[in-house]
């Protein structure tokens, strides 16, 4: 399809999609969630580098499940007391400026805690047996992200009984390190680091909860199935964050969301006529799913990851056609069933 067939400019339409109609949002005010937030970075960077061994002992006592993950998984150190002591001393010295910036921006995390607590109320509403993790903030390497089971990279990570929030990736889009050439080339290009803002923390955290409940194992499947499986993830995320802006959940800008909504029919026609929906070729799939500034073959106004957005619309249509289905039933429904029964034919 020629690029000129897409509508490029809708100057007022973004206003229509900032707060979508969520239908009936359940009342979760009576659901008790005792969310605990622990500040690992404060204890870690308070260690006296002259007596690191004593400080590490206190860390292991206070954070018994998190500390081994921090040193082994986050810092990538072997299980050697001597190496951990030396590298901890070195890390504290080299990264103190990053910690100080995080401390300045996140001295009080009360608002973030309140938002997460509200999100977890919705989690408990839909999945009462889900165990709420302790939130642990940290400052880790500025050049390392956590690799998730589905192959994506996340700023945060989920452990057995904790959810780690890496504050070094939420220091504001204008933070100087994010604009250094090494960081842009090797860690996060600016179309991603523009989201390294405080308001994205709850959505990033809830994405981990969604993936914990229903891991995305669609890799290797045809494009249309991956689109729908990933669309399910955003559909459930929307259930956990019904009052939050779609821009925070998708990572799209408001203008990109407006473009998607204005061109939904053309985008779907593009997929159908391109004959790519059944492809399993990774290089083709990568063009439509995953992080990128825009979608190749579509106007610059389009966002990257357009495939997940289309999958989300299909799942929403399927859920609307089947209002009696519970979230678990929708999340476990076969992609082909969802596609067929959604009767998805946007104009």
PLM region descriptions:
Residues 227-294:
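Acidic/His/Gly-enriched intrinsically disordered linker/tail segments
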Residues 20-89, 93-94:
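N-terminal mature-domain "stem" immediately C-terminal to a signal peptide or N-terminal signal-anchor/transmembrane
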Residues 15-18:
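C-terminal motif of bacterial Sec signal peptides marking the signal peptidase cleavage site
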Residues 45, 75, 121-128, 237-245, ...:
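Sec-exported extracytoplasmic/periplasmic mature domains
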Residues 87-257, 332-335:
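Acidic/His-rich structured neighborhood in mature extracellular/periplasmic domains
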Residues 1-6:
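Positively charged n-region of N-terminal signal peptides that target proteins for export
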Residues 272, 278-347:
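C-terminal soluble interaction/assembly domains
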């Amino acid at each position: 399809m020629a690029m000129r067939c897409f509508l490029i400019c809708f100057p007022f339409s973004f206003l229509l999609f900032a707060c979508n109609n969520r239908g009936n949002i359940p009342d979760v005010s009576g659901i008790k969630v005792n969310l605990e937030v622990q500040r690992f970075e404060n204890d870690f960077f308070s260690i006296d580098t002259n007596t690191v061994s004593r400080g590490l002992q206190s860390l292991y006592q206070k954070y018994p499940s998190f500390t081994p993950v921090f040193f082994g998984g986050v810092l990538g150190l072997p299980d050697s007391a001597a190496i951990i002591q030396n590298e901890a001393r070195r890390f504290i010295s080299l990264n103190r400026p990053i910690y100080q910036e995080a401390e300045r921006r996140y001295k009080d995390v009360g608002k973030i805690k309140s938002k997460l607590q509200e999100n977890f109320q919705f989690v408990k509403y839909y999945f009462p047996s889900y165990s709420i993790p302790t939130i642990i903030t940290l400052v880790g390497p500025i050049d390392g992200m956590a690799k998730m089971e589905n192959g994506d990279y996340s700023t945060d990570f989920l452990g057995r009984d904790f959810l780690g929030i890496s504050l070094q990736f939420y220091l504001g889009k204008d933070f100087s390190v994010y604009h250094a050439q090494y960081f842009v080339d090797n860690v996060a290009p600016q179309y991603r680091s523009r989201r390294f803002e405080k308001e994205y923390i709850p959505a990033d955290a809830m994405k981990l909860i969604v993936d914990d409940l229903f891991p995305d194992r669609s890799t290797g499947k045809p494009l249309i199935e991956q689109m729908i499986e990933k669309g399910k993830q955003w559909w459930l995320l929307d259930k956990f964050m019904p009052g939050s802006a779609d821009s925070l959940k998708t990572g799209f800008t408001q203008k990109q969301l407006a473009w998607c909504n204005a061109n939904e029919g053309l985008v779907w026609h593009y997929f159908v006529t391109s004959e790519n929906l059944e492809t399993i070729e990774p290089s083709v799939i990568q063009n439509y799913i995953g992080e990128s500034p825009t979608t190749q073959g579509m106007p610059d106004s389009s966002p990257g990851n357009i495939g997940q957005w289309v999958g989300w619309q299909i799942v929403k249509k399927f859920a609307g056609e089947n209002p009696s289905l519970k979230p678990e039933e929708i999340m476990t429904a076969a992609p082909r069933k969802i596609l067929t029964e959604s009767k998805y034919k946007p104009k």
